[in-house]
């Protein structure tokens, strides 16, 4: 019987099957950061338990760490306590890898794991963070979990899960100039909606997806949760294997050969049946910009802000009206006439070396517009930062008027010093544009790194295809 990739991943990890369709699944990799782990470790201690398999753990602080003035430490007392608690917990119990604050390898977990080869095809990967779906780029069954589940995985190395339906999102054809994985992700969400993937595990396929680099695939899978799906993944191919070879925690020698032989089975079989299939033409996808307070509120950069009056569904119409009021926008305003205040290039969605190269290629020889108050470039990890500096990208950003920062989650979310002030509008390469996501009253527009760079130069949203 032909199987989907999801079928294979699920069946390979079932420890016990319940009659109601739920199953106890074994967890291969547990990623831990400072925000969702303190209560879990405390629960273990109160119960007199120890972690079941510390060799599954990869940990680093990322949400609360500052991205500048590291010599001053972490000023906010709550943030400092969370980071210090993570440090104490991991030093007590151990881990496969721990990259503490100021370690040259620290950074955003969803960047650090893959670049170190700690995310390998066929794994189940969990983390107390909703964007764990990023790791699905490696044909992993990866998803976010809550704090109580973090404790459960620490104690048992298992999770009780209900099987999802399957969806294939196929993007066929060749992407045009200036169109990136981020644009593909936003176009998909704009097509299926933020609830379109609810209850599904999404496999991304098609010639355009196969043409993406691993970093592009990570961007795509990172956004799966924004389409309602806990899981998003891409089948293994030569691109996957070539990326992993020689990474610190990748297998070596004969073990590598055996691993590769297994990894090459991690694809949907010919004739495998999906519960839903969605197909997009790559040629139809243009650079995207969100206009509202949900990732599904997105249009092409050459479009206008939608008019709620044209929406027949009263619930959707009301949501659009509220979003426009919060965002301070009027219907039918051309996207390329919307001025910005700040620019953020970073986050677990778009802070890898290819993202920084992409933005730098637009910025080189140009400068941030006078109306832009702040432009941040925040590498996703210390390793990415060092690579970018070796290539001279930091000099390009600084010459263009950007601040070149230390690694961390930064302005993706208002849990550290990098945030928007009320009413400020930001071109952001992050993954969520909810009300207050980047700071109370802040207005977030999601774009690709290239589009963020183009907006920084113009002082408003601009079509990056015109400057490439």
Curated annotation (Swiss-Prot):
PROSITE patterns, alphabetized: ACONITASE_1 (PS00450), ACONITASE_2 (PS01244)
Keyword Ubl conjugation: no
Record's keyword terms, sorted: 4Fe-4S, Amino-acid biosynthesis, Branched-chain amino acid biosynthesis, Iron, Iron-sulfur, Leucine biosynthesis, Lyase, Metal-binding
Disulfide-bonded cysteines: none
Molecular function terms from GO: 3-isopropylmalate dehydratase activity; 4 iron, 4 sulfur cluster binding; metal ion binding
Coiled-coil annotated spans: none
Residues holding [4Fe-4S] cluster: 348, 409, 412
Cofactors, names only: [4Fe-4S] cluster
Subunit structure of this chain's protein: Heterodimer of LeuC and LeuD.
Name this polypeptide is given: 3-isopropylmalate dehydratase large subunit
UniProt organism field: Dechloromonas aromatica (strain RCB)
């Amino acid at each position: 019987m032909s199987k989907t990739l999801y079928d294979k991943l699920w069946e390979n990890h079932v420890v016990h099957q319940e009659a109601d369709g739920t199953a106890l699944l074994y967890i291969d990799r547990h990623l831990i950061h400072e925000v969702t782990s303190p209560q879990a470790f405390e629960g273990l201690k109160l119960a007199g338990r120890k972690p079941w398999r510390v060799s599954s753990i990869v940990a680093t602080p990322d949400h609360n760490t500052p991205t500048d003035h590291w010599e001053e430490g972490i000023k906010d007392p709550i943030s400092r306590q969370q980071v210090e608690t993570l440090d104490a917990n991991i030093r007590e119990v151990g881990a496969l890898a721990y990259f503490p604050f100021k370690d040259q390898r620290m950074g955003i977990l969803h960047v650090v794991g893959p670049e170190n080869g700690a995310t390998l095809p066929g794994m189940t990967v969990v983390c107390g963070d909703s964007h764990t779906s990023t790791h699905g780029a490696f044909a992993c069954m990866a998803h976010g979990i809550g704090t109580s589940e973090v404790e459960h995985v620490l104690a048992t190395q298992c999770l009780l899960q209900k099987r999802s339906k399957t969806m294939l999102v196929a993007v066929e054809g060749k992407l045009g100039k200036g169109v990136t994985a981020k644009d593909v992700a936003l176009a998909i969400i704009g097509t299926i909606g933020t609830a379109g993937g609810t209850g599904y595990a999404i496999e991304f396929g098609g010639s355009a997806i196969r043409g993406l680099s691993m970093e592009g695939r990570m961007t795509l899978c990172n956004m799966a949760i924004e389409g309602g799906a806990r899981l998003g993944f891409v089948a293994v191919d030569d691109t996957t294997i070539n990326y992993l070879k020689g990474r610190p925690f990748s297998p070596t020698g004969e073990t590598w050969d055996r691993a590769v032989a297994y990894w090459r089975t991690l694809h949907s079989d010919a004739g495998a049946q999906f519960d839903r299939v969605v197909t997009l033409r790559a040629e139809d996808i243009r650079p995207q910009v969100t206009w509202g307070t949900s990732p599904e509120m997105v249009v092409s950069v050459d479009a206008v802000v939608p008019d709620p009056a044209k929406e027949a569904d009263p619930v959707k119409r009301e949501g659009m009206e509220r979003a426009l009021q919060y965002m301070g926008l009027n219907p039918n305003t051309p996207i390329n006439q919307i001025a910005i205040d700040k620019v953020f290039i970073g986050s677990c969605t778009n802070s890898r070396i290819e993202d920084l190269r992409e933005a730098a290629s637009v910025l080189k020889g140009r400068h941030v517009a006078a109306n832009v108050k702040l432009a941040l470039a925040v590498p996703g990890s210390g390793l990415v930062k060092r690579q970018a500096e070796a290539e001279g990208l930091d000099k390009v950003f600084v010459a263009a008027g950007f601040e070149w920062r230390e690694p961390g989650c930064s302005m993706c979310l208002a849990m550290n010093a990098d945030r928007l002030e009320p009413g400020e509008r930001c071109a952001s390469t992050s993954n969520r544009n909810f009300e207050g996501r980047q700071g109370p009253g802040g207005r977030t527009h999601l774009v690709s790194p290239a589009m963020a760079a183009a907006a920084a130069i113009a002082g408003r949203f601009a079509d990056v295809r015109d400057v490439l």
